[in-house]
Amino acid sequence: MDCDNGVVSEISDDKELLNLETVIPPPPNDSGHEFIGPSSGPPQVTITPSGVQSGSANGVSTSQQQQYSAEYLSQLLKDKKQLAAFPNVFHHLERLADEEINKVRVVLFQCEFSKESAPLPDAEGDSTVHTEKVFVPAKEHPDYNFVGRILGPRGMTAKQLEQETGCKIMVRGRGSMRDKKKEELNRGKPNWEHLSEELHVLIQCEDTENRAKVKLMRAVEEVRKLLVPAPEGEDDLKRKQLMELAIINGTYRSGTDQSALAAAQLAAVKHQQQPFAAALQAAALQRGVLPMMANGLSRSPTMAVCGAPIVMSPSGRASSAGATATSQAALIMQQQSQLHAANAGNAALQQQAALLQQQQAAEYQQLLLSQAGLYDFSAMQQQYAAVGQNAAVAAAQAQAQAQYGALAAAAAANSAGNQQYADYAGVDLTSQQSAHGGYYVRRWA
């Protein structure tokens, strides 16, 4: 860049990556005094997305402010959530996303607090903690949400107020906790004495006494502005807070999304109404009236939901069209009557088939019962025969055992006598049966 007699000529390279605007102070005036601009430092250069630079006090150009929108902030938050799935991977992307989110949020949702801050005096003395209480008019406005208005979504409004005033903003007192049960349990305990007081905003400032008074005065003034209820529908701060909360929660819908949703709902309603319109058209045909879309008829602009359309004045071709519609209606009625007759015949055939099936089932059950009785009688006879055979076998076994016992006893008697007889005659004196399986007693002569 060459400068000659206050004339600046810009020399850009072949790539033309960046163009810089340099503010040249005007020449000295007639009085000989040099003009001093608003700031003695170097000019601030802000690079816009289009490559145009413009100075700005807060580092955000006018073109950027026009481009920022709630949809853009919602997209940035979604991108940040996607980056969170890869922790410690895209360090620069996370930092750039956070910076852009903060910048857009400041432009869109920054509360318009008073920018005229009183100059702070020089520090005198030691730093101490100074507090102020601003009571909330909850009794005058019991249905107004003062706590949410002061804190904002995720405490963003209170944080912004803390940054601008240099004080700490806290909501204390009865009704300051979201969990009412926990509030009742903690009331009266140490470090929870504020729950016994009325709802108020506690402002703390840690600084020297002379500087803390200035900070507290400004903070009290801004808090009192927030405690003035705005009319319904005219609260711009509440609108911004609700929009920011919806964006944070991911439930924000832009105007484009809402119009698309409305179009989808309308299409669904039309799709559901198509069967109803077809039913109305069929009813009109059955009554011998032309359908709604038939040519050659002029109807009233409004028509009842149910019933036939009102024919106001048929044209010249109405007679031929009416005859055609009548013949079509008669044909449809004939087809419907034939269909009903066929359905009735099918129903009668089905009833007859069902009766035949029931009769066959009853006969089959009777046959099964009779066969089951025969099978049971023969089985009983077989069981009785088996029992008789078992009894006969048992009696034969008992008789054989008795005979074997008698023979054994006779053999024992013969061996015990140990006498030899030349000839003898056996005479049966008595025959006694002493018990079951008894034996005969013989006397030897």
Swiss-Prot record:
Signal sequence interval, chain numbering: none
Identify the stretch(es) annotated as Disordered: 22-63
User: Which Pfam families has this protein been placed in?
Assistant: KH-I_KHDC4-BBP, STAR_dimer
Please provide the Gene Ontology terms (biological process) for this protein.
mRNA processing; regulation of alternative mRNA splicing, via spliceosome; regulation of mRNA splicing, via spliceosome; RNA splicing
InterPro entries hit by this protein: BBP-like, KH_1_KHDC4/BBP-like, KH_dom, KH_dom_type_1_sf, STAR_dimer
Question: Which domain of life does this protein belong to?
Answer: Eukaryota
This protein's GO CC annotations: nucleus; P granule; ribonucleoprotein complex
Q: Name the major location.
A: nucleus
> Where do the KH domain residues begin and end?
145-171
Ranges for the region named Qua2 domain are 230-253
Q: Where are the transmembrane segments?
A: none
Region Qua1 domain, residue ranges: 71-128
Read off the CDD domains from this record: KH-I_HOW
- Site (Important for RNA binding) found at R178
Instruction: Report, from the record, the phenotype seen after gene disruption.
Output: Defective alternative splicing of the unc-60 gene which results in decreased expression of the muscle-specific isoform of unc-60. Double knockout with isoform c of unc-60 rescues the motility and actin filament disorganization defects in the single unc-60 isoform c mutant. RNAi-mediated knockdown results animals that are viable throughout embryonic and larval development, and furthermore, results in defective alternative splicing of the let-2 gene, whereby transcripts containing exon 10 are not formed in larvae and so the muscle-specific isoform of let-2 is not expressed in body wall muscles.
* SMART domains assigned: KH (SM00322)
The UniProt site entry described as Involved in RNA binding is assigned to N145, K168, R172, K238, Q241
- Residue(s) at site: Important for the interaction between KH and Qua2 domains: P153, L245
Q: Name its cellular compartments.
A: Nucleus
Keyword RNA-binding in the entry? The reply is yes
The entry lists its GO molecular-function terms as: mRNA binding; pre-mRNA intronic binding; single-stranded RNA binding
Q: Where is the composition biased (Polar residues)?
A: 42-63
Describe, as the record does, how this protein assembles with itself and its partners: Interacts with sup-12; in the presence of RNA, but with weak affinity in the absence of RNA.
| Protein purpose | RNA-binding protein that binds to the 5'-NACUAAY-N(1,20)-UAAY-3' consensus sequence in pre-mRNA introns to promote alternative splicing. Required for mutually exclusive alternative splicing where it modulates the switch between mutually exclusive exons during pre-mRNA maturation. Involved in muscle-specific gene expression regulating the alternative splicing of genes such as let-2 and unc-60 to ensure that their respective isoforms are expressed in muscle.
Q: State the domain notes.
A: The KH domain and the Qua2 region are involved in RNA binding.
Name the UniProt record assigns to this protein: RNA-binding protein asd-2
Gene this protein is translated from = asd-2
